[in-house]
Amino acid sequence: MTEVYDFDRSSWDTKGSLAPILPTTYPDGRLIPQVRVIDPGLGDRKDECFMYIFLLGIIEDNDDLGPPIGRSFGSLPLGVGRTAARPEELLKEATLLDIVVRRTASVKEQLVFYNNTPLHVLTPWRKVLTNGSVFSANQVCNAVNLIPLDTAQRFRVVYMSITRLSDDGCYRIPRGMFDFRCKNALAFNILVTIQVEGDFCSNRGNLSMFKDQQATFMVHIGNFSRKKNQAYSADYCKLKIEKMGLVFALGGIGGTSLHIRCTGKMSKTLNAQLGFKKILCYPLMEINEDLNRMLWRLECKIVRIQAVLQPSVPQEFRIYNDVIISDDQGLFKIL
């Protein structure tokens, strides 16, 4: 049995929205570079120079003989760096980068990025830019099938999204808890409904994910479990959730991210599951990459958040990560 409880609007009203990046052009039709700054935190970190940078741009032919042919809209996550440079300075240098893009494959299709331009204000992000980086193509590219192999490609930066990391302490991305299951436990999930504004019809993707310009995604927080082989009631778990004093915000980690901060009391078991951290970050790039790509530069805001309590999936249930499912005859060999 699934039980659903609504959080009060005050838990996300302050920072539960993201401003759009509205395209503007020069007289010749070229896009004017823009930077967006997001601060999903409470501002209690003493040093405010830490930030996460996410680049958006166009993957196009690297051909000096004529106007470049744009192949697809893409992104390049640079990660966390520390700098006192102004956002405009960071954007200016990013637009001057010579970022080469190459299409390849491993378990999934991938895109390789590396920069050939000397760095100045972007030096804190040299690990990704200078040493090169490889990402899952579906996470960073709208249409990887349109990227050719016989023509050199470059990534031309058009937009920059900066997320200030102003919360005191570190951010926990609880990957290790996603597959944790326990007998007689109740799984605590969060269902987020967002309202999307803007010209999302121009984005490549599955528009059916929006109903009345709204979309939902769910994240797993942890499990409520007792030491003895007994289960908590849903009403008791609701009281525990209310005592946690959860505050929600939207950030720009990996494109769009959900930030959750516990301002109250957390149960010892759940606290241990989360590594004794009370600031959680869920990048939509890892949770729902299709929705994340649709939201890259659109305006979105939280309109509803619900706590979802469900029985934890039994331990005997197997998790299948591929389409082979089960091959008892030994006809498929996984290398």
Curated annotation (Swiss-Prot):
Subcellular location per the Swiss-Prot or TrEMBL entry: Virion
Pfam families for this protein: Matrix_Paramyxo_C, Matrix_Paramyxo_N
Entry keyword set: Viral envelope protein, Viral matrix protein, Virion
GO terms assigned for molecular function: structural constituent of virion
One GO term of the biological process aspect: virion assembly
Superkingdom of the source species: Viruses
Family: Belongs to the morbillivirus/respirovirus/rubulavirus M protein family.
Its biological purpose: The M protein has a crucial role in virus assembly and interacts with the RNP complex as well as with the viral membrane.
Name listed for the protein in its UniProt record: Matrix protein
Organism: Phocine distemper virus
